[in-house]
């Protein structure tokens, strides 16, 4: 697993993002005296997110959640009469897409400049039990004191 940390930075904000799960590791904001404070709960190093203590316990610190966020009861759902069985990772239910959700995956990352980051991931048909190939793009950007997160996804099946 090749971990990498990316930094978005301007005069107001500094954001550290990991390619594992698109995790927002740090978000430094400035107070009225211009002192920086990290307002994100998480670990000190990127490597700690790849350790079994994190990966096997599902804390989801700062991570992108998907393909589905929340619990699916009994880890199964039905579309047009077809039942889809999912990974059971939460007392017989499927939480945040199971043990191989987006939070546990290495994303492809492009950083065109200091204020923009583009993350991409393809989730193949049947991964985790979900139907359809899903192409996901997440954009992190900062402008002055605004941090934006834009999610886009397309799937080839309903």
Describe each model-derived feature in a short phrase.
Residues 1-158:
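Surface-exposed acidic/polar loop and edge beta-strand patches at domain peripheries
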């Amino acid at each position: 697993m090749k971990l990498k940390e990316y930094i978005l930075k301007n005069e107001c904000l500094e954001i550290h993002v990991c390619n594992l799960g698109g995790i927002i590791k740090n978000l430094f904001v400035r107070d009225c005296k211009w002192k920086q404070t990290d307002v994100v709960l998480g670990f000190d190093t990127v490597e700690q997110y790849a350790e079994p203590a994190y990966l096997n316990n599902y804390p989801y610190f700062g991570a992108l959640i998907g393909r589905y966020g929340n619990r699916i009861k009994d880890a199964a759902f039905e579309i047009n009469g077809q039942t889809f069985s999912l990974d059971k990772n939460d007392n017989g239910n499927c939480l945040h897409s199971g043990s191989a959700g987006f939070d546990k995956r290495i994303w492809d990352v492009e950083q065109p400049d200091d204020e923009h980051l583009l993350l991409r991931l393809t989730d193949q048909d049947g991964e985790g039990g979900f139907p359809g190939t899903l192409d996901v793009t997440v954009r992190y950007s900062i402008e002055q004191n605004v941090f934006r997160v834009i999610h886009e996804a397309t799937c080839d099946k309903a």
